[in-house]
Every structure is written in structure tokens, then in C-alpha cells.
UniProtKB/Swiss-Prot annotation:
This is Large ribosomal subunit protein uL14. Binds to 23S rRNA. Forms part of two intersubunit bridges in the 70S ribosome. Part of the 50S ribosomal subunit. Forms a cluster with proteins L3 and L19. In the 70S ribosome, L14 and L19 interact and together make contacts with the 16S rRNA in bridges B5 and B8. It comes from the Bacteria. Keywords: Ribonucleoprotein, Ribosomal protein, RNA-binding, rRNA-binding. Belongs to the universal ribosomal protein uL14 family. The gene is rplN. GO terms for biological process: translation. GO terms for molecular function: large ribosomal subunit rRNA binding; structural constituent of ribosome. GO terms for cellular component: cytosolic large ribosomal subunit. It holds the Pfam family Ribosomal_L14.
């Protein structure tokens, strides 16, 4: 579960390394986000030659969560870190590569490009 003001790692090559959560999208009372949810973030750390710069406000989708998710078949998937991929308004990633594994639930939520770029889908 990711709350507002949480710091997250960035799992793509858009230039950002760490982001801070400003807002969880999906309703006025929604306070937490999990895998597949869209959040609005501020870039806290970035490389100087990247697409996004420090201080920029971007949209991102959560691809890994320490809290984990419960599947209908009884599996519980949990990751080692909280990570996001920075996206455009049409659900496509701003970077051209995705680092690390991503959850299969992203395919159900319409992020097919992120799933196809990921080296491993769990």
C-alpha cells in the first residue's frame, strides 16, 4: 500500500530515479494505492540527461509493492521494493525500457506496453 508523501523508486529509463507521491487518483476519498493504480508524483531525484527533470510533476503507475496483492487462486505476491513507471496520458510509458519484474495485474488494467517491455511478469 502506497500513501501520499511516500517515496518510490522508478523502474524505467525516463531519467527519474525517485519520486514522491502527491495524490492517489481514483476518487476523492481514496488514500492508498496498490499495484496498477495511477498516482501523481513529483520527481525527487533524476539524472541530468533524462527526459524528466527534478521537480517535474508526472503521472505514474505502480508496478511493484511491498504490501503485495492477493490473487483469486490463493497466491500472495509481494515484492522487495515499491516501484513505479512514469506514464503519459494514454497509458504508455515515457521511457523505452522497464527494469525488474512487474505484476500480471497490469495486463488486466490495460498497461500492455509496460508488460511487454518488462523482463519478467509475475
Amino acid at each position: 500500500m502506497v500513501l501520499e508523501l511516500s517515496k518510490l523508486n522508478v523502474a524505467d529509463n525516463s531519467g527519474a530515479k525517485e519520486v514522491g507521491v502527491i495524490r492517489v487518483l481514483g476518487g476523492s476519498r481514496k488514500k492508498t494505492a496498490n499495484i496498477g493504480d495511477v498516482i501523481i508524483c513529483s520527481v525527487k531525484k533524476a539524472i541530468p540527461t533524462g527526459i524528466v527533470k527534478e521537480g517535474q510533476v508526472v503521472k505514474a503507475v505502480i508496478v511493484r509493492s511491498v504490501y503485495g496483492i492477493h490473487r483469486e487462486n490463493g497466491q500472495h505476491i509481494r515484492f522487495d521494493d515499491n516501484a513505479v513507471v512514469i506514464i503519459k496520458d494514454d497509458k504508455t510509458p515515457r521511457g523505452t525500457r522497464v527494469f525488474g519484474p512487474v505484476a500480471r495485474e497490469l495486463r488486466d488494467k490495460g498497461y500492455l506496453k509496460i508488460v511487454s517491455l518488462a523482463p519478467e511478469v509475475l
